[in-house]
Amino acid sequence: MIRTVLHKNRNYNLPNKQEYEKWERLQILGTFAGTIAGISGIKIYPKKNHPFTFVSVKHKTRIIKFKSDIMKTLIQHQHANVIPFPYDRSCITTGIVHIGVGNFHRAHEEYYTNQLLSDPSQQKWGICGIALLAGDKSLYSALKQQDNLYTLTVCGRDNRDIAYEIGSLKELIWGMENPDAVIHKIAHPEIKIITLTITEGGYNIDKASGNFILETPAVQHDLKNPDTPQTVFGFVAAGLRKRMKAHQGPITILSCDNLQHNGNTARKAFCSFIAAQDSELADWVNTNVTFPNSMVDRITPAVTPADIERLNRHNGVEDAAPVYCEDFIQWVIEDNFIAGRPDWEKVGVEFTTDVSAYENMKLSLLNASHSMLAYPAFLAGYRKVDDAVHDKRFARYLQQFMDTDITPYVPAPGHTDLTQYKQTLLERFGNRSVSDQLSRLCSDGASKIPVYIMPNLIQMIRDKADLRRVSFFTAAYRHYLKYQQDDKGNIYEVNDPWLTETDWIQIREENPLAFLALSPFKSTPLQRDEGFVTNYLQLVSALKEKGVVEVLETILQ
């Protein structure tokens, strides 16, 4: 039996009556002896091999781990600088499965849900995280050893950071360790929503045709072996099949990835896979599964070992899986949930009948600006977004891109002030506390460019608009991929897994025009536009001869 004691908005899980009485005695002692270990600033977690373990707190300049026997010790300590979750976690049940438990999910959906669970009427909406990839093992192991709890540090633009203890991730399953548990969980009657962060390229959609790619080896394996899936499509299909056969009711699949019309993309991917595998299930999905579109926004950097040390030192805890993010957050969702949903609007989520205008604004301004900045800034020797944006040349370049190139194609949604939105973007990019990595923005360009850059570039070409900045971006992307050395002589590795072997042949071609046939550009024949080609060829040569900064200065004139 776990007793939960609420003290100064903190929850203490005490395993038995003896420990509960010990806690009460320490409360009395605390009146006379000051701060007692285990009373203030300490969170107790039940663990498999320990009666309980405490989150560490900072004691002067060193970190102390508290074990159960130290409750008898009187010490002076500063409180851990973390706001605990404001609910009894033992009362939370799981109503959401999330596939792809990365940093963004833990800073975004979990953040909203963690707040919402303080409402007793919403406590059926805890989250079960599902990891499916081999690379997920380290994060899975780190979270499991601390009962899926972690700290989220929100970094303010005013240099004030606030750390939260996140308790909404009630369960965590690693598909490579227990695939049957994944299928069973998706089929469970209490699960009403499957949310996804599987990256822009994870939906396996051909960029040119817009069709789901059935021919990949992993997809072919899952089509032929429905009971032993390897892909997200196979796992979801297996779970839905089990759900259908057990008559466990409808369910919503909600994409939280940076894709325009991400719900439509998710529907295309999953329904195409299921139609190729199981016609009966395909019919069931058509009437029992909805795919709302959504727009998500919160800059969440990759976490390095140095970040872990820094965050834990600042927060006074020992967290093996901390995450940090900016203070801006937004989530806009089409209200199309067939099996019910959390009242996320109580904690700031916006619901609408059509998310398109919000998607277009965010993808065209924020995400496109990230890509426009990433390659030239990295080639100039910068490694962090905030450092690059504090270079007035790059800030001006982004401002011109947003104002001149993009704003004509972005109608403001709702009551949004686009001028203020763009100013806020530059402030967010320059947030010194976040220090997002340019390498993260450079990665996976082949799946980002068709979504963030190409839709507006196509319109710009049709309108015979000024193409200098997008030509500069294209030339910088080629230089980044082809030479893999920045202007300061630093060698780097490229992480762009969606580039094909044919793409790499074209990248290595000495003729720069071959690059314009790359798969990310297939939605429009760039080679046919004389103005774009002229600008692009001039900039390719200039980047090689003069370097990014000197070329950028000519563009800004």
Question: Can you name each region flagged by the protein language model?
Answer:
Residues L26, I42-I44:
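Intrinsic disorder/low-complexity segments
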Residues G30, G34, G38-G41:
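Residue-identity detector for glycine
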Residues M71-Q557:
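Substrate/ligand-engaging "lid" and interaction regions
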